[in-house]
Design a protein with these regions (language model features):
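C-terminal structural segment of proteins
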Residues: 1-326
């Protein structure tokens, strides 16, 4: 059985205090729910000397707002709190769908919104115990100089596996980042980098404090998730689609975002252009879903074959669009 190594533990009471600790210690790592981090520590993917817990910072909890003014969700809100909040289920049901698809009831009651947005990228090679990785040879993401999945590449192709990120992008959400230098607002799309090693566009001492979702404005959205089992599993493909239809059924706005097919969520802008300005006819749906599948570039570093996952992009985008057109 894999165990945790020794480490120091800090429990600051404010975001500013937590950020100051990150500045003072280069070996400090943030933890909130820990449902992703602790297994990674057990596998020695991360070896922190100091864990900085955010669980004692009350200001990071809570959900406030509505569909008319927009919604602000504290980063320490658990996924169960998000999935069952009337503020979410009433005006942003797609966010409830995505959060309810994560893990199990036990995991959702511990895992946090901020943790899901910031969780590490995944790879079938990297996500192995230390002894296995040491025997085969380390990879570019941890301790080595080659990507074992794509040896000819000079970058890491570990996969973004957040269920919340594609939905947040489809809703045009933003996040608040706080550090000792102050606070800044960043669109969720800009939060992610297409790099399996350094996948977040955050300074080391920045802390994600809130997710801000703009007024719904009649936006309809759907999230579909491909996985090997009906529960627990990380996405092998996540599809978030949002559309705004006028009274005649004409699509005036479309967003199509693919998760788990790259090191960051992928926005299918060509599909969005196809959908905008017309009704969601079968032909439009086929064109948009085909274009999304063409754009997807999954690697053979997670469950199921990359060919199957790529083919299912078209199927899932089409399903989501048809559900929204109904």
């Amino acid at each position: 059985m894999l165990g945790l190594p020794p480490f120091a533990y800090a429990s600051p009471k404010t975001v500013e205090e937590a950020s100051e600790i990150l500045v003072s210690s280069q070996h400090a790592v943030l933890v909130s729910g820990g449902t992703d981090l602790y297994p990674n520590i057990k596998r020695r993917q991360v070896e922190p000397r100091l864990l900085v817990s955010l669980s004692g910072i009350a200001a990071l909890r809570g959900i406030r707002g509505d569909g008319d003014r927009g919604l602000t969700i504290g980063a320490l809100s658990t996924l169960e709190e998000v999935a069952t909040s009337p503020l979410v289920t009433g005006r942003y049901p797609v966010l409830a769908e995505a959060t309810m698809s994560v893990g199990s009831p036990q995991i959702r009651n511990g895992a946090t919104l901020g943790g899901n947005l910031c969780q590490d990228t995944r790879c079938s090679y990297y996500d192995m115990p230390l002894g296995w990785r040491k025997g085969v040879g380390y990879c570019l993401k941890r301790g080595g100089d080659v990507c074992r999945i794509a040896p000819g590449s000079d970058r890491c192709w570990a996969v973004s596996s957040s269920d919340i990120a594609p939905v947040a992008m489809a809703l045009n959400a933003s996040v608040s980042l706080v550090s000792t230098r102050g606070e800044r607002l960043m669109g969720v799309k800009s939060l992610y980098r297409n790099d399996g090693v350094s996948h977040l566009s955050m300074a080391r001492d920045e802390i994600l404090t809130e997710l801000k979702i703009p007024p719904s404005g009649g936006l309809k959205a759907k999230y579909l998730k491909l996985r090997q089992r009906g529960t627990i599993d990380f996405p092998l493909l996540g599809v978030a689609v949002a559309v705004r239809l006028d009274e005649q059924g004409v699509c005036t706005l479309a967003r199509v975002v693919l998760g788990a097919v790259g090191s960051s969520p992928v926005e299918a802008e060509a599909s969005e252009e196809i959908l905008t300005g017309g009704k969601l006819t079968d032909e439009k749906v086929k064109q948009a879903s085909t274009e999304a599948s063409r754009l997807a570039r999954p690697m053979d570093n997670t469950g199921l074959t990359l060919q199957y996952r790529k083919a299912m992009v078209q199927v899932y985008v089409a399903r989501a669009l048809k559900a929204l057109a109904a």
